[in-house]
A protein has these predicted regions:
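Extracellular beta-rich repeat passengers
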Residues: 1-177
């Protein structure tokens, strides 16, 4: 809710395998002051949003975790940010220190959870993502891309669905199906 209370249900979407490109694209675009493309992820108000296996580029800043409730969600593993690549931010601000958030807090989960903010656009190595206006971009990865391998789906937030099976059930004495 707008107050960030602990009321249920808690906003807790799970995003996986996204390529997210902001308006600043390859980092050469300058937008006017006051534009609304400052942060790729602004997690606030007790959200428990989780993001896995995602590549992000094209913003001034990367991940902003705002407020003690959101910090508690990270520490409690309700909010998970894992195996993501945040690349090519104009000012190098891949993580943002908000009130109550310290560099040690980010370090406690950033690298252990497989996140990377050191990769460059050249290392991501898209086929032809940043094209001239009117030319269709190609967001596939070239051979040798650092992002081509490494996705993982082992976190408990991912669930498995068992295949339906057949079982013998006794409906009444002596009869089975």
């Amino acid at each position: 809710d707008a107050q960030g209370s602990s009321s249920q249900p808690l906003t807790a979407p799970i995003f996986s395998n996204f390529t997210i490109i902001g308006a600043k694209s390859d980092g050469t675009v300058s937008l006017p002051i006051g534009e609304k493309f400052e942060k790729a992820f602004r997690l606030r108000r007790n959200t428990a949003t989780s993001v896995f296996n995602t590549i992000v580029t094209g913003w001034e800043k990367g991940l902003s975790i705002e407020g003690t409730a959101v910090v508690a969600n990270v520490n409690g593993d309700t909010l998970v940010f894992s195996n993501n690549s945040l690349t090519n931010f104009n000012n190098g601000a891949n993580t943002i220190l908000s009130s109550g958030v310290t560099p040690a807090f980010y370090q406690s989960f950033w690298t252990p959870d497989g996140n990377d903010s050191t990769e460059t656009i050249a290392q991501i190595n898209w086929v032809n993502l940043f094209t001239a206006l009117g030319v269709t971009p190609d967001a596939r990865l070239n051979a040798g891309s650092v992002a081509a391998n490494g996705a993982t789906f082992t976190h408990p937030k991912f669930f498995s669905v068992a295949a339906p099976g057949v079982a013998n059930l006794t409906y009444c004495q002596g009869a089975t199906a």
